[in-house]
């Protein structure tokens, strides 16, 4: 793997200092810390503050650490959707988010274009949508949604929560947090 650079979601080449950071963490006992200790609380606060600073996340937004995008998709559907979500599908990952809504007994509305294509700006107006699910950069195809496309939903769906999957695009784009409710990566 040495010298190999992958421009795919994974595996990714690890930065050369990671090994030393891991050894240091084990020497300091960090992997064995209880999540109830002051030390862990300090590490969590530093990580949260760092993520907020890096991404420009407003102070009234919360940061949660989860294990995977699948967990985020499941939790967002379980906790934010009583009945109906609106999904924009243009590849494998946006499709999976929609499938999870169906598996959890919800009634997702799917706006789908062929894999690898973007969406036109004529967005259908569905009533009683509780969540609009968008994938900023569809990892399976590399198609990226323009910010103007994402930002229009706050006006079109003022009562819906706007969820943006930014797994393969952060930290580079700058999101307008007044236009979205949840951003995950």
Kindly give the residue locations of the regions a language model identified.
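N-terminal "arm"/small-domain region of PLP-dependent enzymes with the aminotransferase-like
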Residues: 1-34
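Conserved beta-strand elements of the Class I
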Residues: 64, 84-88, 130
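Active-site-proximal loop->helix
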Residues: 79, 96-107
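Active-site phosphate-binding strand-loop segment of PLP-dependent enzymes
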Residues: 117-171, 182
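Conserved active-site segment immediately N-terminal to the catalytic lysine
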Residues: 176-185
């Amino acid at each position: 793997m040495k010298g190999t650079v992958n421009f795919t979601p994974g595996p990714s080449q690890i930065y050369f200092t990671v090994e030393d950071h891991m050894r240091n963490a084990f020497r300091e006992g960090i992997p064995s810390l209880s999540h109830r200790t002051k030390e862990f609380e300090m590490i969590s606060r530093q990580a949260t503050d760092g993520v907020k600073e890096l991404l420009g996340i407003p102070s009234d937004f919360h940061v949660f650490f989860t294990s995977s995008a699948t967990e985020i998709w499941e939790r967002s559907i379980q906790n934010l959707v009583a009945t109906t979500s609106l999904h924009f599908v243009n590849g494998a990952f946006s499709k999976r988010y929609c499938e999870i809504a169906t598996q959890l007994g919800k009634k997702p509305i799917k706006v789908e274009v062929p894999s690898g294509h973007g969406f036109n700006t004529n967005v259908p107006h569905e009533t009683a949508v509780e969540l609009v699910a968008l994938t900023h950069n569809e990892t399976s195809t590399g198609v990226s949604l323009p910010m103007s496309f994402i930002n229009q939903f706050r006006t079109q769906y003022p009562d819906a929560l706007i969820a943006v999957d930014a797994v393969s695009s952060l930290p580079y784009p700058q999101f307008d947090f007044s236009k979205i409710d949840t951003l995950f990566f």
